[in-house]
Amino acid sequence: MLPGDVLLVSSVISYLGCFTKSYRVELMDNFWIPYMIKLPDKIPNTLTKEGANVLSLLTDDVIIAGWNNEGLPSDSMSTENATILTNSLKWPMMIDPQLQGVKWIKNKYNKTITTIRLGQDGYLDLIEKCVSEGRVLLIENMPEDVEPVLDPLLGRQLIKKGKAIKLGDKEVEYNPEFKLFLHCKEGFIYNHLNLIPMQL
């Protein structure tokens, strides 16, 4: 990847997830790409050419077909969302009233996923187990107000040189294979997360 490609791809992953398709296109076509073209010292890239697809650098037809087989809808917005979701360093929050993204995530990780809702019996123990064993955790129907005990997890605030995380009064061993997916049906925003609107 050329430096300009890295700049555009990282911008898409970091900032576009929470926007609608039309606003994503507007930002790319009317702001970001024209800005890159007008720079006096051009940054080498392949993405300012007509018809270039930023996310094609992160995925291909085989990966997309796999996602579709796992239940992801085949429209371009869902493909963009999945690409952003799978490449983000922040935990993704899926705004998903129709449960399209939830269905896909459950199918994609069907053998290793644990699904919980905050407040259910023993949910903190399940979170600790997933974190320490490197499992995939899906928290469904996230409330607008999240318990402060989860802040270190949402913000990936690792301690002991990245080997542990504090959950409440416990230090839990952090397995780097751990993955967290969050789901809500409403569009409230968390600063620690990468929002992915999965509605059609």
Question: Model-predicted segments: where are they?
Answer:
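Conformational switch/transducer regions in large eukaryotic molecular machines and scaffolds
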Residues: 1-200
